[in-house]
Amino acid sequence: MVVPSPPFGPSEPLPEMEPLSKEALRRAALDARKAFVRTLSDAQRARLEQKLAPHLTSLFAGVAVVGGYCPLGSEISPLPATEEARAVGAIVAYPCFSNPAKPFRFLAGDPLEPGPFGIMQPARRHPVVQPDLVLVPLIAVDGEGTRLGRGKGHYDRALAGLKKSGARLIGVGWAMQRLSETIPGDDWDVPLDGFASPDGLELFKRT
């Protein structure tokens, strides 16, 4: 069960204000995430990432392919959990861009070479796979599963196809990234099925 946490962490609450635009909310949430991570020692960060792992592994039963991600900057790492998935026989795949203008694909290989955006990805010789479960990095998420990403649209394009294939989409982040307010949505947004943090796993109900 998720322990409720303030939208931007206990140390840096947002003041009362008019609802922010999506871009302003993105900047505020990203700044808050960076500020939160700066308060953590390496040991504290590692403990929180280990605390996240069982909430993710609880979703692995019957999953043949897990779509993971390489954490960038202040993103929380799912790697302790994906290593457990590999240990029990699941394939762990990572996003790979061959053309920045097209949706990325998941390749069943370790992310060992830099992609076009500086994010490590598998070599293109590895096979393309279809994940059953996708772990999705984010800047923020609300109670409807609306995800706030970096604003480039890469995950939006990829998630649309993955959702149609029946993949389960789970956002992954620090507890303070779960916002109490509603994130402004766009027609192309693909809602997440849940959100996992060190505090727990929340599965979103569809109305």
Model regions: which residues?
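Surface-exposed, charge/polar-rich loops and edge strands
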Residues: V2-L25, D31-R38, R125, V129-V134, ...
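Charged helix-capping and loop-helix junction motifs
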Residues: E83, R150-D156
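Short glycine-rich anion-binding loops that position phosphate/pyrophosphate groups of nucleotides
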Residues: L72-S74, I139-G143
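A short beta-strand-loop-alpha-helix capping motif that often carries His-Thr
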Residues: A101, V134-L138, G151
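N-terminal active-site beta-alpha-beta segment that forms phosphate/nucleotide-binding
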Residues: V2-V129
